[in-house]
Amino acid sequence: LSAAGAGMGNRLTCALLRRVDYRLWLAVRRRLRGSRPQRRFRHRHAVALANRQSLLGEGKLDFAWLMQRRQWLDMAAVSARNAALMSHLAHCSAQLDQVVEPLHRAGVPVLLAPMHTVSDVLATLVGAGVYPGRATVIVSGDVQAFARRSPEDEWRQRLDYCSIHDDPRHIAGTLSQTMLEAAEHRRNIILFPDITPDYTLHSNQDVAAKLACHLFGRPAHLHSGIVRLSRALRAQVVFYSLYFDR
């Protein structure tokens, strides 16, 4: 019954998001939800608060709202094709393309490196919208599973996936073909460099697997795989990050 109710709720949300500006929808939903975290996010909310206080000091963080907002944004883009959101994503792609296309024209392969901000799905769609119009995204299971459940549209024609959870031989074959096409300027590779802790915990424990640097005016620790891949391709890494323009 609960699963059926959730499915009906998602269909209703999707139908509304096809007709309502996503910013209005988010504003109304936030006013209605109250301040208490949803039960499924409660423990992660507590961990997120502790991490924020440890790293950045005191400050308010509504983790449950951030997670819910991300899910609605993903639905608005992939399933509902919300007109306002699609326009904003196209604008972001156009900005990114001002950097990417000249690099390709100059004979330099491109490795796109979005941050884990706002939504991984939206960041991937922005990267898929730049020259030459095709990309392979190296992902964990979440983005790939979400995209495969989405309706058939141009995003699924532009994007291919290489999951870090696949069989190693399959990963090697997929990456080899992807790198060949990237070197020939037929596609970009999208890799989230601030890769989530689950990958690091289940792979290389070596300190060398992390790279200390500065990004967007802040200290950062990135997974060094982005460096190795860019060196192998002799590619230019283009970092980008989505944010809410207030």
Show which residues each predicted segment covers.
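Hydrophobic, well-ordered secondary-structure segments
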Residues: 93-99, 107, 168-178, 238-240
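Short, flexible loop segments at the rims of nucleotide/cofactor-binding pockets, characterized by
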Residues: 85-92, 164-170, 215-217
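Catalytic core of membrane glycerolipid acyltransferases/transacylases, capturing the structured
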Residues: 106-170, 206-207
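Membrane-associated lipid acylation/remodeling enzymes share a hydrophobic transmembrane-juxtamembrane segment
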Residues: 133-135, 187-245
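Membrane-anchoring hydrophobic helices of lipid-metabolizing enzymes
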Residues: 1-120, 125
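Catalytic core segments in nucleotide and nucleic-acid processing enzymes
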Residues: 164-169, 177-184, 203, 224
